[in-house]
Regions:
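An interfacial alpha-helical scaffold signature
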Residues: 1-213
Length: 213
């Protein structure tokens, strides 16, 4: 088993990847590690090893497996199999900096799969920080800075087009779509929506995108 810095694992890029996690069927009185399998070979190996010990295999997105380890007291670490020749162990503490991002992903994923109403999703996300390509009117503006945002053309149900503000969960995610190398800024989601007076769309290039009008 090996330890790898969490920032080197690229977990954010794989949040919606379907994995197999092994949960105990009975509630445990002592904390245990959550095993997650990325490959079928590792799934088969872990089933043979863990099912006789009272574990069951559950398919879910990697982001939800991370959320379980972060939020639930009875998990002490995440063990990932299939990413490298050896299993990789990541402690709960190492995952904590991802807590807000993982929480946002779970909300967005549930809404994208019609398990959460858009309005409820907004209530859960409105106080979160998001990133956008551009600048707001702030004290940190320098001469030559432009108050602007990068938008995306959208089409409403009646066929009319409108523009939504592109937002992202991380600065690194925003930079992937920032070919013009404009400033990347962060802001409270509700404030950003009110400031521009436009709909916002979060992670528009991913399968779990969400839009708030």
């Amino acid at each position: 088993m090996m330890r790898v810095p969490v920032e080197n694992l690229g977990l954010f890029e794989q949040l919606d990847r379907i994995v197999v996690a092994f949960f105990r069927k009975q509630q445990s009185s002592s904390p245990y590690d959550l095993y997650v399998s990325i490959t079928q070979e590792h799934v088969d190996q872990k089933k043979q090893e863990l099912e006789p010990l009272g574990y069951q295999a559950v398919k879910l997105p990697l982001g939800m497996a991370l959320d379980n380890v972060i939020q639930q007291a009875h998990f002490k670490a995440l063990i990932i199999g299939g990413l490298a020749p050896e299993e990789i162990i990541v402690s709960k503490e190492a995952l904590m900096p991802m807590k807000d991002i993982v929480d946002s992903f779970c909300i967005m994923y549930a809404a994208a799969n019609n398990r959460l109403e858009n309005g409820k999703a907004y209530e859960l996300m409105k106080d979160k920080t998001v990133y956008f390509i551009g600048k707001l009117l702030t004290d940190s503006l320098k001469k030559g800075d432009e108050i602007s945002y990068m938008g995306i053309e959208r089409e409403s149900a009646d066929g009319t087009s409108y523009e939504a503000v592109k937002c992202f969960l991380t600065k690194e995610s925003a930079e992937q779509y920032n070919d013009a190398k404009r400033p990347v800024s962060h802001a409270n989601l509700a404030y950003l929506k009110a400031f521009w007076g436009n709909p916002v769309i979060i992670e528009p290039h991913r399968n779990y995108w969400i839009e708030f009008k």
